[in-house]
Regions:
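Intrinsically disordered, low-complexity segments enriched in small/flexible residues
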Residues: 97-116, 121-123, 127-178
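CoA-thioester-processing core
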Residues: 51-108, 139-142
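A short, small-residue-rich loop immediately preceding and capping a beta-strand
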Residues: 34-50
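Short beta->alpha connector loops at strand-helix junctions that form conserved
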Residues: 46-47, 67-70, 131-133
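Hydrophobic/aromatic residues within transmembrane alpha-helices
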Residues: 5, 57-58, 120
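Glycine-rich phosphate-binding loop at the start of an alpha helix
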Residues: 21, 52, 114
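Short, well-ordered beta-strand core segments
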Residues: 42, 64-65, 129
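Glycine- (often His-adjacent) and acidic-residue-rich active-site loop
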Residues: 1-29, 80-83
Length: 178
């Protein structure tokens, strides 16, 4: 996700902006609370630009996977583009949750272009990368691994979702069911 449309937010009424921010904060906090309780785990699979609020949602997940296609990036561009700090916990999640070094977090937050590939892994901005030809395999592998850590209540089985059948054509990607 490229995050919020800042220009749209700038033209919105104050109460709408407040509710928007509350909702996005509650979403991220809900991810982390569900994860901490062990009942649900979240994986962000990033294929493209993941900036601002979009990256903050990814930061709330248990793992971040990034396609290594030389153009997909993660960024918190609020400082260089808007002159404000990421306002909904992005910097805190970078340093406290992901254990990104403070000097790298400073560089990251002042670079509007973002970070990609191996550098994103080295800086602890994402957990895993894979080239486009292996990205879906990485997703399947990590989902299998992470889902095995989910604590089911009272010995009950969780819901097993059937896989979506994906058909990739020149016109785009189609699914049998959504």
């Amino acid at each position: 996700s490229a995050g919020a449309n800042i220009y749209m937010l700038g033209q919105s009424e104050h109460t709408w902006k407040v509710n928007f921010c509350k909702f996005t904060n509650e979403t991220r906090n809900g991810f982390e609370d569900s994860s901490d309780s062990g009942s649900i785990k979240f994986i962000a699979a990033v294929n493209g630009i993941c900036a601002g609020g979009g990256y903050e949602v990814a930061l709330a997940c248990d793992e971040i996977l990034l396609i290594d296609d030389r153009s997909s990036t993660v960024s918190l561009p609020e400082v260089p583009l808007l002159g404000v700090l990421p306002g909904t916990g992005g910097v805190t999640r970078l340093i406290d949750k992901r254990k990104v070094r403070k000097d790298l977090a400073d560089i990251f937050c002042t670079n509007a272009d973002g970070v990609r590939g191996k550098k994103a892994v080295d800086w602890k901005l994402v957990d895993y990368i894979a080239p486009p030809s292996k990205f879906n395999d990485l997703i399947d592998e990590r989902v299998s691994k992470v889902s095995s850590t989910v604590k089911l209540r009272d010995g009950k089985e969780g819901i097993k979702l059937k896989s979506l059948n994906r058909n990739i054509t020149n016109e785009g990607i189609q699914y049998d069911t959504v």
